[in-house]
């Protein structure tokens, strides 16, 4: 795992990948889960972006642990703000996994079934996708929205705690 990139701590650079891709993956997931036209247009891109975001989380977290060990006397002498940021950062991986799993599930279900908000017809034509009951589509959408909102909220909490750790007590200007 990289600890420095061009002389800078890797965490401060890699975090931008997570900051950008988690919300994008979450937005794509919600759009795909609730809007069939978006799901058709986005296709495999939604789980692909979610997978890259998921892969970036542990790499960034590990780089953050390295940075934590090298800040202000090592991990044993950290101020509470840095410890809080590290603790919150460790909680993002389950949300990233949830976003990826739901993105993959919505993509697979969308390819195999007609995930629309209309009731299923009594008969289907040969060669058409079988329509799932509306309640299944609704459950998938609710779970997709829940993991997306949870992941973005956790990301904001992590970012805020990191900014507080870095900038508290400092002035600009």
Regions found by a protein language model. Give the residues of each.
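Polytopic transmembrane helical bundles with strong interfacial aromatic enrichment
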Residues: 1-173
């Amino acid at each position: 795992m990289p600890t420095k990139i061009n002389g800078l701590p890797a965490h401060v650079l890699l975090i931008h990948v997570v900051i950008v891709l988690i919300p994008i993956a979450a937005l794509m997931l919600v759009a795909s889960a609730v809007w069939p036209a978006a799901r058709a247009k986005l296709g495999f891109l939604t789980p692909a972006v979610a997978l890259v975001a998921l892969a970036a989380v542990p790499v960034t977290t590990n780089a953050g642990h390295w940075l934590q060990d090298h800040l202000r006397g090592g991990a044993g002498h950290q101020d509470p703000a840095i410890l809080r940021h590290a603790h919150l950062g460790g909680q993002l991986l389950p949300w990233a996994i949830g976003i990826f799993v739901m993105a993959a599930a919505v993509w697979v279900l969308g390819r195999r079934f007609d995930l629309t908000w209309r009731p299923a017809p009594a008969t289907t034509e040969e060669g058409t996708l079988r329509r799932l009951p509306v309640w299944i589509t609704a459950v998938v959408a609710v779970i997709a929205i829940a993991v997306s909102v949870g992941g973005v909220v956790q990301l904001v909490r992590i970012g805020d705690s990191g900014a507080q750790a870095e900038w508290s007590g400092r002035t600009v200007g």
